C-alpha cells in the first residue's frame, strides 16, 4: 500500500537535499575500488585523442598499484612514474572537476559519481559523467551545463 505522506516527505527531503547540494563539496569521490576515479590515470587523459561531441571517447587508462599517491583525501593511481610525478607537481591541473562527481548531475544540483570512461576535457579541465544517456544531455550544451555546475558547486 502506498503512503502519500511518506511519498510527500521523501519528495521534500530530496528537494531539500538538492537545494543544499552546494555544501556537498569536499574530498575526492572514491568508489569501491578504494581509488579516486576508480583507479584510472587522470594524467593519461591528456594523451588520449578526444573524440568530437556526440562520439564515444577513448577508454581511460588504468593506473597501477605501484604508482600511487594520496591527495584530497583519496588514493590516486597512475600508469607510469612520469604520470605520477606530473600529478604530484600539479594535482589540481589533472584532478577531475567536482571531486570526480558527474558534471551533469552537479549542474542539476545533485551529487552522483562520475564514470572515468565518460569524460571530456574542456578548457583544460577534466569532466566526468555517470552514463551514456547523461553524456548525450550534457553534450547538447556543454558550456551551459558547466556554467550551471559552477553555480551549484562551492
Predicted regions and their residues:
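Bacterial N-terminal signal peptides
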Residues: 9-19
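N-terminal leader/assembly segments
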Residues: 3, 20-25
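Charged, low-complexity intrinsically disordered segments
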Residues: 23-154
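Bacterial N-terminal signal peptides that target proteins for export
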Residues: 1-10
Amino acid at each position: 500500500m502506498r503512503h502519500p505522506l511518506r511519498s510527500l516527505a521523501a519528495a521534500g527531503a530530496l528537494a531539500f537535499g538538492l537545494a543544499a547540494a552546494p555544501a556537498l563539496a569536499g574530498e575526492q569521490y572514491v568508489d569501491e575500488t578504494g581509488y579516486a576515479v576508480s583507479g584510472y590515470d587522470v594524467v593519461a587523459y591528456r594523451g588520449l585523442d578526444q573524440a568530437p561531441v556526440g562520439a564515444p571517447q577513448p577508454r581511460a587508462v588504468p593506473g597501477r598499484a605501484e604508482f600511487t599517491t594520496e591527495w584530497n583525501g583519496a588514493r590516486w593511481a597512475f600508469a607510469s612514474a612520469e604520470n605520477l610525478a606530473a600529478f604530484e607537481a600539479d594535482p589540481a591541473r589533472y584532478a577531475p572537476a567536482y571531486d570526480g562527481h558527474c558534471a551533469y548531475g552537479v549542474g542539476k544540483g545533485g551529487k552522483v559519481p562520475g564514470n572515468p570512461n565518460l569524460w571530456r576535457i574542456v578548457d583544460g579541465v577534466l569532466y566526468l559523467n555517470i552514463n551514456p544517456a547523461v553524456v548525450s544531455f550534457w553534450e547538447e550544451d556543454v558550456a551551459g551545463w558547466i556554467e550551471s555546475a559552477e553555480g551549484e558547486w562551492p
